[in-house]
């Protein structure tokens, strides 16, 4: 992995929104640990969230087109909320905060500019991507609390495998402390990113979502500076020594989702 200094990014770096949100200053914002609460529908009789798992590898452009159409339908009230679990062929995506210098090998894999928040990330086989299309008007119109809830969903999923995932206030996503690795130059403990978050809101309906590394080829991250952070690495469940399958992770994701966001409906 590349080494260097962590660039300072705004607290909303993983978010792109077309909704009327006015973030307060950093000193006024509570920490995301304090923000987390169950992100449930306000109506007791709200329909469950549709839960779909795609087979095989999903073309990225097809996924974008599907999300755009589904978000529109959700806004219009003709489609329910949806979580869509996919895997992609190897590719890089650039969020709205991406720095061109962080794309180290542009010819390695296809590169897609996307409207989600965040910087460069990698998607590929062995990584579970969950596209989250929820109507925050039915829940809470609170972007930072929503991000904290997405992080909690990941943290509870990892806990099912006895992995302690952690938040970092200056870095959206979920991190794992690696005490077995050499300490950083400043003496702090090594930390690796195991899950990324990048979302977009369109009139309070979310899309894009989260990505958890199950067993991807971690060397593929070498073509970018992941999320603009060069002093920390990336890891996966299998890299941490867990012989888990994608199916195992999907089961854990489903249970943790219901804990944080409420009922879901599978087909």
Swiss-Prot record:
Domain (BPL/LPL catalytic): residue spans on this chain: 77-265
Region (Disordered): 1-30
Catalytic activity, as annotated: octanoyl-[ACP] + L-lysyl-[protein] = N(6)-octanoyl-L-lysyl-[protein] + holo-[ACP] + H(+)
CDD domains according to UniProt: LipB
GO MF annotations in UniProt: lipoyl(octanoyl) transferase activity
CC terms in the record's Gene Ontology section: cytoplasm
Annotated residues for binding of substrate: 116-123, 196-198, 209-211
PROSITE patterns: BPL_LPL_CATALYTIC, LIPB
SUPFAM superfamilies with a match to the protein in the record: Class II aaRS and biotin synthetases
Residues of the site described as Lowers pKa of active site Cys: 193
InterPro entries hit by this protein: aa-tRNA-synth_II/BPL/LPL, BPL_LPL_catalytic, Octanoyltransferase, Octanoyltransferase_CS
Swiss-Prot/TrEMBL keywords: Acyltransferase, Cytoplasm, Transferase
Active-site residues, as the UniProt record annotates them: 227 (acyl-thioester intermediate)
NCBIfam families: lipB, PRK14341.1, PRK14345.1
PANTHER family linked to this entry: LIPOYLTRANSFERASE 2, MITOCHONDRIAL-RELATED, OCTANOYLTRANSFERASE
Assigned protein family: Belongs to the LipB family.
HAMAP family with a match to the protein in the record: LipB
The name this protein goes by in its record: Octanoyltransferase
Native source organism of the sequence: Brucella abortus (strain 2308)
Gene: lipB
């Amino acid at each position: 992995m590349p080494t260097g200094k962590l660039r300072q990014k705004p607290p909303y770096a993983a978010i792109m929104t077309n909704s009327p949100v006015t973030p307060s200053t950093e000193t006024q914002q509570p920490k995301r640990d304090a923000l987390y609460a169950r992100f449930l529908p306000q109506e007791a009789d709200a329909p469950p969230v549709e839960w779909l798992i795609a087979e095989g590898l999903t073309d990225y452009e097809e996924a974008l087109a599907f999300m755009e159409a589904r978000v529109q339908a959700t806004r219009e009230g003709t489609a329910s909320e949806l979580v869509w679990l996919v895997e992609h062929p190897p590719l890089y995506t650039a969020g709205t905060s991406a720095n061109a210098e962080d794309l180290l090998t542009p010819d390695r894999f296809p590169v897609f500019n996307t409207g989600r928040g965040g910087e460069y990330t990698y998607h590929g086989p062995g990584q579970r991507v969950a596209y989250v299309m929820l109507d925050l008007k039915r829940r809470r119109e609170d972007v930072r609390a929503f991000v904290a809830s997405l992080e909690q969903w990941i943290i509870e999923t990892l806990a099912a495998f006895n992995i302690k995932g952690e938040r970092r206030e200056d870095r959206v996503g979920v991190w794992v402390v690696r005490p077995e690795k050499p300490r950083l130059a400043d003496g702090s403990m090594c930390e690796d990113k195991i899950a990324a978050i990048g979302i977009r809101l369109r009139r309070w309906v979310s899309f894009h979502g989260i990505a958890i590394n199950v067993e991807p080829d971690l060397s593929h991250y070498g073509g970018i500076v992941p999320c603009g952070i060069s002093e920390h690495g990336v890891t996966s469940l299998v890299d941490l020594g867990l012989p888990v399958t994608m199916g195992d992770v999907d089961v854990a994701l489903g249970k943790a989702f219901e804990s944080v966001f409420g009922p879901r409906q599978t087909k």
